[in-house]
Design a protein with these regions (language model features):
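Bacterial N-terminal signal peptides that target proteins for export
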Residues: 1-10
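C-terminal segment of classical bacterial N-terminal signal peptides
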Residues: 15-24
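Short, low-complexity N-terminal intrinsically disordered segments enriched in polar/charged residues
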Residues: 25-65, 80
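A beta-strand edge to alpha-helix "cap/lid" segment located at domain peripheries
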Residues: 26-31, 105-201
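Aromatic-acidic/polar surface patches that form glycan- and anion
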Residues: 39, 43, 55, 78, ...
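Generic alpha-helical structural signal
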Residues: 44, 48, 83-86, 90, ...
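A solvent-exposed, acidic/Ser-Thr-rich amphipathic alpha-helical stretch
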Residues: 59-132
Length: 201
């Protein structure tokens, strides 16, 4: 009963916050190129490969999702280039057992899940906003339990015919100053894409 009441209050607060935000101007309809479906499929495949690489500790596959000069930002800081990205994620992975472990103290088995993604493609550049969550067998009796969740802010570029991350910013709703904030992330993505495309004309 108490949980139900808390959820209702949380939802009411979220609705009140949303209602208090200024209404953005109506966004122009996004125009999709004839190749959008193919580009989107390749980008979604890249996102999936990124997550499989994390969960199975395949760091060669992980860094291969980034351009040579790619950038990764997450709770541990900002890393640029394959070597720095590899060091950042392997160091983080070694310490994950402190946060997620089974009843007998062993490191829990983590699985990352990507939810909906909005993807904008303009020529050889793309932007994406996705929601993600992380589960592990660290619940009571080693049952699966959601550990955390957040959003991915991605900038991508086509390199030698393949889509790669130029920059990935991992936002986590449980970490102060690393959450997504109240504004619609897709609207922000569209505005960023419009600035870049407009600047090239």
């Amino acid at each position: 009963m108490r949980t139900t009441i808390l959820r209702a209050l949380a939802m009411a607060g979220a609705l009140a916050t949303a209602a208090s935000l200024p209404s953005p101007a109506a966004a122009a309809p996004v125009k999709y190129s004839a190749h959008y479906g193919e580009d989107r499929a390749e980008i979604e495949d890249l996102m999936a490969r990124y997550l499989f690489a994390i969960d199975y500790f395949d760091w060669d596959a992980y860094v291969a999702t980034f351009a040579d000069d790619g950038e990764l930002e997450f709770a541990s800081g900002v890393s640029r280039g394959h070597d720095a990205i590899r060091k950042a994620v392997t160091d983080f992975s070694k310490g994950i057992g402190r946060f997620y472990h089974t009843a007998d103290g062993k490191p829990a088995k983590l699985r990352h899940i990507i939810l909906q993604s909005a993807i904008r493609v303009e020529g050889g550049h793309a932007w994406a906003r996705s929601q993600w969550l992380e589960m592990a067998n660290h619940g009571e009796g080693d049952q699966p339990k959601i550990g955390t969740y957040g959003e991915y802010e991605d900038t991508l570029k086509r390199v030698n015919g393949h889509w790669l991350f130029a920059r990935r910013n991992v936002l986590n709703e449980f970490i102060p100053k690393r959450n997504s904030g109240p504004a619609d992330p897709v609207a922000a993505m569209d505005a960023e894409a419009a600035r870049v495309v407009g600047g090239k004309r």
